[in-house]
C-alpha cells in the first residue's frame, strides 16, 4: 500500500504524494495526516495518479524517503521556494538547510547526526546546514 510522505498545495486544495512523487489522494483541505507540507511553490492541478516531475519537489521526496521513520515524523515542512536553498523545518521550527537537496541520502544522514548532536548537547540553535563539505550547527 502506498504511504503519504508529503502534502503539496495545489490550485484547488492539496495533493497527498508517495515517495515516488505519485499523487495518491487529493482533497480540498488538509485532514489529519502527519506528513510534511511542501511549501514555496504552487502546483497547478494535480490529479489522482499524476506523478510530479518538479526537481526540487522530487529531491525533497527522496530526502524524506531517506530519513529514518522516527526522524521523518519530526519534519513538518519543506520549503522549495528557492531550488538552490531548500529548507526543511522540524516540529520545533528548526530550519534544516538542504541546499539543492543533491545527495538526498547523504543529507538525510547528516540531518540525523546534526539533530542528535543538538539534542545530546541541548544546544540553542538558529539552523542546521547539511552541506556535505561543511556541515554546520549554527548556534544562537
PLM region spans:
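Charged, solvent-exposed interaction patches on well-folded alpha/beta domains
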Residues: 1-140
Amino acid at each position: 500500500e502506498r504511504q503519504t510522505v508529503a502534502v503539496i498545495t495545489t490550485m484547488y486544495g492539496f495533493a497527498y504524494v508517495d515517495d515516488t512523487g505519485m499523487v495518491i489522494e487529493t482533497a480540498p483541505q488538509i485532514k489529519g495526516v502527519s506528513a510534511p507540507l511542501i511549501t514555496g511553490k504552487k502546483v497547478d492541478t494535480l490529479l489522482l495518479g499524476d506523478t510530479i516531475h518538479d526537481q526540487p519537489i522530487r529531491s525533497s521526496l527522496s530526502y524524506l524517503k531517506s530519513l529514518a521513520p522516527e526522524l521523518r515524523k519530526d519534519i513538518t515542512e519543506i520549503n522549495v521556494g528557492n531550488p538552490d536553498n531548500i529548507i526543511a523545518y522540524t516540529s520545533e521550527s528548526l530550519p534544516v538547510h538542504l541546499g539543492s537537496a543533491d545527495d538526498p541520502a547523504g543529507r538525510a544522514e547528516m540531518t540525523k547526526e546534526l539533530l542528535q548532536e543538538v539534542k545530546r548537547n541541548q544546544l540553542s540553535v538558529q539552523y542546521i546546514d547539511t552541506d556535505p563539505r561543511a556541515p554546520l550547527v549554527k548556534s544562537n
